[in-house]
C-alpha cells in the first residue's frame, strides 16, 4: 500500500519539524509542547539542529501536558555541494556513530560561526560575546547563523532575524562561510545504524541553494534507505511539491509536513503544515523507542 495519502497538506495531524532554544529557536521545549496542545495538534516533534539536548525537557513537558511527542533531530548534511537538511526520528541517541557525527558537526559549526563573526566585525558593531549573549542554553545549544542574526538585531542593525538573513547573514553574502558537514549518505547510514527513520527536509526550497537536489541524487538516497520526503513545507513551491509527491509515490516513500517553527525566530506558524496520523504511526513503527533513555 502506498504511503502517499494526500495530494494536499492534511488539515489535522502532527507538526514534526520544530526548533527550540537548544538550536536556533527562541522558545523552550516546554513552550513548544504547550503551544501545540493549545492549537489542538495531535502531536508534535522536537527537531533541533544536530543535537538531542532538548529531548529530556520535551519529554517531561509532553508527559505533563498529555500530548504525544516524537523525538527527532534536523541533521546538517551536504550532497555534491548542495546543502541538505535531514530529519531523523526514533533513533537511539546513545549510538556512538550518530552522537560522534553530531559532536563533529557542532564543533565545525562553532568554528565557522566564529570566523563569520570575525569578518562581520570589520563592518558591523558586533563581537563574539554579543553572539554568545543570544545563546540561551550555553554549550548545549547548537550555535550558528541565527545567533549572529540575533546579535545584529540587538545591535540595531536589522529589525528582525529574517532581515539579517536577507542581507549580511545570507549564504550569498561576502561574510558567509559554509559549515563542513557529513554527506547525505553518511547521515542515512548513521541514522539507520542507530535504528532511526530519515526524511529529507524542504528538498524543493529554491531559496536555500543555487541548485536543488536532482532526481538522480534523491534516487541515490532512496537506494541508501531514505524513508521519506518533507513535502508540506512553506519553502517548497507548488511545482516542487508536485515533483516530490511524484517521487514519493514512485518509490513508496513517507510524505511528511512541518512548520519549521522557530518561535519568534521565523514567521513560520506552528501547525501551518502537518503530517497525518498514519504517517506518524509508520515512523513510530519503523524506528526504535528513542525516549526510553530519558
PLM regions and their residue ranges:
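Extended substrate/RNA-proximal surfaces in nucleic-acid metabolism proteins
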Residues: 2-5, 61-215, 219, 278-284, ...
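An N-terminally biased module of ancient metal coordination in phosphate/nucleic-acid-related enzymes
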Residues: 1-82, 169-170, 182-266
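A short alpha/beta connector and helix-capping loop motif
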Residues: 32-36, 270-282
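C-terminal regulatory/interaction regions
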Residues: 245-246, 263, 267-273, 284-294
